[in-house]
Amino acid sequence: MLCSIYKSPKKEGTYLYIPKRDDFSQVPDTLKQMFGKPIFVMLVNLEQRQLAQVNVEKVKQSMQEQGFFLQLPPPPENLLEQHKERKARQTP
């Protein structure tokens, strides 16, 4: 299964996967507005490649059911909170 991947100029780390290049007909208008003008990144064969941030099966399922897949950036790490949790576990 081939898919085209686009990145958002508005939201860093946000990517849109669609089955056909430049065919955004299945993407809701509200998502298109929030995403901004898509910037083409690459064409990928999902049968022959793993993806770095997302599960290939989830991408394929979403594209079959909804006509697209939206990849959001991972949540930012809260280093202060992690430090506090480690400290709390260390105290007897």
UniProtKB/Swiss-Prot annotation:
Q: Which Gene3D superfamilies match?
A: YcgL domain
Residue ranges constituting the YcgL domain according to the UniProt record: 1-84
Q: Highest taxon of the source? A: Bacteria
Looking up PROSITE patterns in the UniProt record yields: YCGL
Q: Report the InterPro entries cross-referenced here.
A: YcgL-like_sf, YcgL_dom
- Read off the SUPFAM superfamilies from this record: YcgL-like (SSF160191)
- Annotated region Disordered: the residues are 71-92
PANTHER family under this entry? Answer: PROTEIN YCGL
Please state what the protein is called. Answer: YcgL domain-containing protein VC0395_A1544/VC395_2072
> Which organism encodes this protein?
Vibrio cholerae serotype O1 (strain ATCC 39541 / Classical Ogawa 395 / O395)
